[in-house]
Regions:
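Active-site helix-to-loop segments that bind/position phosphate- or nucleotide-bearing substrates
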Residues: 4-95
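Internal, well-folded beta-alpha domain core
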Residues: 93-260
């Protein structure tokens, strides 16, 4: 079983964590290709391409300039500790013990516009490149064409040892679209998190993102191998609702914190 996550825009390279092992990303050559494209763009071009403020555009141009194919403790940080958005606040990797991080390394994959796929302990240099960015590149007009079936091939290989391969999709559609399902050949289970608002249950982005991280943490802490066990997820007031779910789309609802 693999759990898929989206990356985060917000990054934390200030907090240092000693004694955490690291690995290297799988697609450094491809990342280098993309960085070479990005390095030729001005802050104004990056601002327009990514719809960023002038300050954020300048920051990311500086990141592209500083990016190197050689990763080190000086320029990199483990992905699961570097990402700092809503999903990763829910996951709270900083409080996980080494054994949990080791399990996550083999069962969690973070999809990335620049790195393709990151394992939790893969070193990552800071960047901003969302998967939906229409970046013209040597392989096509966007990142979906650039990555092609590479991401799916990697995930397929990771699942090869499983008799009944299952992917738990906790990523956004923007990122999951980068996975070629014809190549992956696995059962895909989508987890949907809904909150009660305005008289009905609906997906509220902030809460749903955080819940994806909470679900990943739940699986990591319990080292879940059987996907069905995820239906027991009961963190932060969420609960599985069979009547709103089907075989491959599992709905978890929260009426208010602590109440289904």
């Amino acid at each position: 079983m693999l759990l898929l996550l989206s990356p985060a825009k917000s990054l934390d390279y200030e907090t240092q964590w000693e004694g955490v092992p690291h690995t290297l990303p799988q697609f450094v050559a491809q990342s280098t290709e993309l960085i070479d494209v990005l390095k030729h763009k001005t802050p104004a071009q990056i601002s327009e391409l990514m719809d960023l403020s002038d300050n954020l555009a300048a920051l990311n141009v500086a990141r592209y300039e500083a990016w190197r194919p050689k990763f080190s403790a000086k320029n990199s940080k483990q992905a699961i500790l570097a990402f700092n958005g809503d999903v990763y606040e829910g996951l709270d990797a900083k409080s996980l013990p080494p054994k949990s991080l080791e399990w996550a390394q083999n069962h969690v994959c973070i999809l990335s516009g620049l790195y393709g796929v990151l394992r939790p302990l893969d070193w990552m240099q800071p960047y901003r490149l969302e998967m939906g960015t229409p970046l013209l590149n040597p392989r096509g007009k966007n990142l979906y064409q650039f990555w092609g079936d590479s991401i799916a091939q990697y995930l397929h290989a990771q699942l090869a040892k499983d008799k009944t391969p299952v992917v738990i999709n906790l990523a956004s559609q923007e990122y999951f679209k980068a996975v070629d399902l014809k190549v992956l050949k696995a059962r895909i289970v989508e987890c949907v998190f809904e909150d009660y608002k305005g008289g009905k249950f609906k997906v509220i982005s902030f809460f749903a993102k955080r819940a994806r991280g909470l679900m990943a943490r739940y699986a990591i802490q319990k080292q879940i191998k059987n996907p069905e066990k995820l239906k027991e997820f009961d963190v932060d007031g969420y609960g599985f609702v069979a009547s709103a779910s089907d075989e491959n789309r599992w709905v978890f609802r929260r009426r208010e914190k602590g109440v289904l």
